[in-house]
Structures are given as C-alpha cells and as structure tokens.
Amino acid sequence: MAAPLRIQSDWAQALRKDEGEAWLSCHPPGKPTLYGSLTCQGIGLDGIPEVTASEGFIVNEINKKSIHVSCPKENVSSKFLAPYTTFSRIHTKSITCLDISSGGGLGVSSSADGSMKIWQASNGELRRVLEGHVFDVNCCRFFPSGLVVLSGGMDAQLKIWSAEDASCVVTFKGHKGGILDTAIVDRGKNVVSGSRDGTARLWDCGRSACLGVIADCGSSINGVAVGAADNSINLGSPEQMPSEREVGTESKMLLLAREDKKLQCLGLQSRQPLFLFIGSDAFNCCTFLSGFLLLAGTQDGNIYQLDVRNPRTPVQVIHRSGAPVMSLLSFRDGFIASQGDGSCFIVQQDLDYVIELTGADCDPVYKVATWEKQIYTCCRDGLVRRYQLSDL
C-alpha cells in the first residue's frame, strides 16, 4: 500500500493495437514519482496483447481485461482490471449512488439528473423509474429481500419503494435536512438514517414512524453503518425500555461518519456511546469489517482502520492520495475503497498486491456494490461500470 501504482485509464484499449502505448507511474510517499510506459509488441493468437514495460517496471501477467504490473524498486505491485461492461444509458449525468440486489438480478441508482432508476444488472436495461422525491436523491439501497428499495433525498424524506411496480409504499418524515446515508437493521423491519440536520434516526418500516433520535451531534452525518458487535464488547443498556417495534437492534453497533472530523460509535439499542474518534478531516463514509473492526474514510484521503475494543490508536491508516475517500465496502478478507480522483481499489489480506478497478479518468467514483465476483461502480462521468473478478 506504501507506493500506489497508477495507469492510463483506457490502457486496455490503448494496448490492443500494435505499438500502442499506455503510461504508468509509481508514487512513493515523500519521494519523486517514477514514470514509465507499457508498449504492445503485437497481439497473440489468443487475442491477448504481448506487452513490455519500460525500465523500472515489470509486466507479471496480462489477460484481455487485466494486467499485473510491479515496480521492484519500491517493492509494490498492482493488478489493474478493465471494466467487463459499461452501462452508459441508465443516466445522463453524474451517478451519486448505486446498489445491487441480494440475488444479483437488479441494480438501483440515483443521479444528479434528478432520477432514481431500477435496471437489470446483467445488461443495464431499464426496468423501473422511482419518482416521488423532490430535489436530488442522495442514497438508495435494496432491502435484504431484493424486492424493496430504501432511498433518502435532499427533501429530508426517506422513502420505501416496491422494485416490482415502482410504487412508493412508505414515506418517513421528521428530518429537517437532506438525508445523506441509510443503513438497514437486520432483515429490514427497522432502518437508520443520517442527515445534514446532525441527527441519526431509527425508523419502524411497518408503521412508518420514527422510533427515536439515536444521535444528535450538531454536525452533518455523511455516512452511517450498522454492525453486529462481538460478544466481548459491552454495548451498555438502554435508559428506557426499548419499544417492541424495535426489531434486531440488540447487540448492534451504529457508526456515524461526521462532517466535523469525528467518527462516533454507539450501541444501537442502548444509545450509549462506545467511542468518539477525531480524524484528520471530515469523515465521508464508514463500514464494519467484523464484530470489532471498522473502516472510515476522510475528505483528505485517509482510511482509518479502528478496533472498537481499543479505538484510541488506529490499527492502521491507509493513505494513497489526498483525494476524498467516497465509499468503503467490506469485501471477502478485506475491503474496496473508492476516491474522488477516480481510483477504486481492492485490498485483500492474503494478496501481496492491490487490485485496481480502472476506467474512470480523474472523475470521482462515488459508490461501489458487489454481487459474488461482480463489482459495480458509479461515477461522476455518468457511467456504471461492471467488473468481473477472476478467482481471487
């Protein structure tokens, strides 16, 4: 992770023709950047280009959609993946959020063009348009069933939609500012929202009622995450008897990524604080990796890994560039992160190289969603990209 490798965003097209070239660079912190290039020496019988690297770089392996390159001087290597397919017809403008259903069949996305749409994950074909929010939709996600969608908008409303007929079945009102992120508790009888009004609220989907303000922190809540706590963590007990409408909140932690540089963690049912961590800049996003490990990303490009049992000192801080960390997602034995400079990368515990998802050219990648070995990203350039991971 020490010295990120970067590559020309359209390297796969560039290296498909004879003598085609693509640039390459290595960025060791505090040292001069190393620049290099890849050159296509011809196309093999299998349709795979034969590629050589300039001095200081080595091509370890190449396929039609991936190239594994290392920089021995800095002892780093990255496997760059080109998109398997790109969907350009879902939206006309920047795509702010996306999710894939639990069965992998459907995608949902929201855009700066004001729309929220459900589409077929295999080919990007439009299925439904979800209309009803005033102003932009900030976040959208499927419930675990894959048949229902939860969305939050700048109109301070949370809505629940049927993916089958696009009807809005529930609207939650109570926030006084735009909703920036949501999380689903357990199987989805309850949901959590974080807002620009500085509050995180717990909602009862069945009665479309607010079950309580879980946190009121006076600062915009940019990201929320709910996770099951490890048995060793004392979540505290609630001061009042929880409503019988609260379902699945016990033994859960709530994580809040705040604009005031604070990362807040509390017991979801107990409402009791677990820790408050101060970072280098505004926190944009957060996720749980396990019952005690979590990740949170900041506006100045830091990814903090913290242990809830000892949150004062980060387990590690990953910094690859100063670009804002836009999204974080737990994936297999590691995570996927996306940043405001178009980089999107996968870190796995047992891999000694980073997997880079390429294609975005300096445009922020706002959100990542996965289904099995497929990874979907959405970007300011208005494209949804689908990547196919070979065996990790």
Curated annotation (Swiss-Prot):
GO function term, MF aspect, one: U6 snRNA binding
One cellular component (GO) term of this entry: cytosol
InterPro entries in the cross-refs: G-protein_beta_WD-40_rep, WD40/YVTN_repeat-like_dom_sf, WD40_repeat_dom_sf, WD40_rpt, WD_repeat_multifunction
Chain segments annotated as transmembrane: none
GO biological process, one term: mRNA splicing, via spliceosome
Keywords in alphabetical order: Acetylation, Proteasome, Repeat, WD repeat
Pfam families: WD40
WD repeats: 90-129, 132-171, 174-215, 278-316, 360-392
N-acetylalanine found at: 2
Domain of life from the UniProt record: Eukaryota
Protein's job: Inhibits proteasome 26S assembly and activity by impairing the association of the 19S regulatory complex with the 20S core. Protects SUPT6H from proteasomal degradation.
Similarity comment text for this entry: Belongs to the WD repeat PAAF1/RPN14 family.
Subunit structure, interactors included: Interacts with PSMC1, PSMC2, PSMC3, PSMC4, PSMC5 and PSMC6. Interacts with SUPT6H.
Protein's name according to its UniProt entry: Proteasomal ATPase-associated factor 1
